[in-house]
C-alpha cells in the first residue's frame, strides 16, 4: 500500500498534500478552517446539485419550484436548508480563516494571500447570485439594489447595468443568467482553491509563533487529520442544530413573499454575512463614493502586506496590535448590526463612525503600532 501511495502519479499528489505533508508541530485550532472550508464547498456543491435538479430559473415558477422542493421532494426541505445555512457556515469559516491570516501574519505568503482574496470575491459573488434564485421579495429587491450600484460607474454605468439585467429591469433574463453563473462559479472556486493549496505547499504553513519551523515538522496524518475531524464534528453539529431547530434564523421573512416589482419591502438588506459591507456602502451619502468604499472594504486586504511595519510576523507577542485587531473585530460586528437596521438616527451616525474606524485601524493605526512595537523591542 505504501508503494502505491508514494509511486502512483495521482495518489502521490494526494499523499504529498494530505498524508506525508510536513506540518509545523505547534499549529493551533485556528488552522482548522482551511479544511472546514473545503468541506463546506463540497457540501454546497452536492446540495446545490440536487436542488438544481428540481429548481426552474423562470420568474413565473422559481418561487413555486422552491416551495415544491420543500414540500414534495423526498428530504427536499433538509437539502434546501443545508444549502442555505451551509452558506452561513461557509462565511463564518471564511471570515475566521481571513482573521487568522491577519492575526498571525500569514499574508506574508503573498501568492497564497492574493489567490485567497480572489477566492473571497468569487465566493461572495456566488452567494449573492444564490440569494436571488428563490425569487422572493428580498431576492428581487436585493438584486435590483445591488446590481443598480454599477450605474454609479461614470459614462458606461447605465449601459452596464442594463447589460447585466438583460433588459430594463431585473426579470427573467437576469434570473436565468444568475442561475447559470451560480451553478458554474463553485467549480471555478474549487479550481482556485486547488491553486491556493498549491501556493501554500510551496512555502509550507505558517505557525502561531511566526518563526520558521523547518527544524520541527511532523506529518499531517495522523496528527492533523484527527484534529481536523474534531473541527468537522463541531461544524456539522452547529449546522445540524441550525437546520433542524431554526432553519430560518439567519434568513429574511420577506423572502417567503413572492417577488413583486410593484411593492418595495420597508427595509432592503442582503444576507447577514454581507451586512458589514452594506453598512459601509450606506454610510457614504454619495453613490459612487459608497460603491468605492464597498469594494475597498474587501480589496484593502490586498495592501495589508505592504502595510506590515513590524519586525515580528504575527501578533502573538505584540500587545498593541492585538488590541487593535480585536477592536477591528468589534467594529466589524458593529457594522454587521448597523447594516441590518433602518436608515435613521442614530444608526446613520454609528455606521459612519464605524466605517471611518474600520479604514483608520487598517490604514493608519496598525502600521503605527508596528513601528511603536519595533521601538519597544530595543528597550
Swiss-Prot record:
Binding annotation for a ubiquinone: 201
Transmembrane segments: 33-53, 77-98, 113-133, 178-198, 226-246, 288-308, 320-340, 347-367
GO molecular function: metal ion binding; ubiquinol-cytochrome-c reductase activity
Keyword Transmembrane helix listed: yes
Binding site for heme b b566: 97, 196
Keywords, alphabetical: Electron transport, Heme, Iron, Membrane, Metal-binding, Mitochondrion, Mitochondrion inner membrane, Respiratory chain, Transmembrane, Transmembrane helix, Transport, Ubiquinone
Entry's Gene Ontology BP terms: mitochondrial electron transport, ubiquinol to cytochrome c
Main location: mitochondrion
Membrane-topology descriptor: Multi-pass membrane protein
CDD domains for the chain: cytochrome_b_C, Cytochrome_b_N
GO cellular component: mitochondrial inner membrane; respiratory chain complex III
Cofactor: binding details: Binds 2 heme b groups non-covalently.
Miscellaneous comment text of the record: Heme 1 (or BL or b562) is low-potential and absorbs at about 562 nm, and heme 2 (or BH or b566) is high-potential and absorbs at about 566 nm.
Family: Belongs to the cytochrome b family.
Descriptive protein name: Cytochrome b
Organism in which the protein naturally occurs: Panthera tigris
Taxon lineage: Eukaryota, Metazoa, Chordata, Craniata, Vertebrata
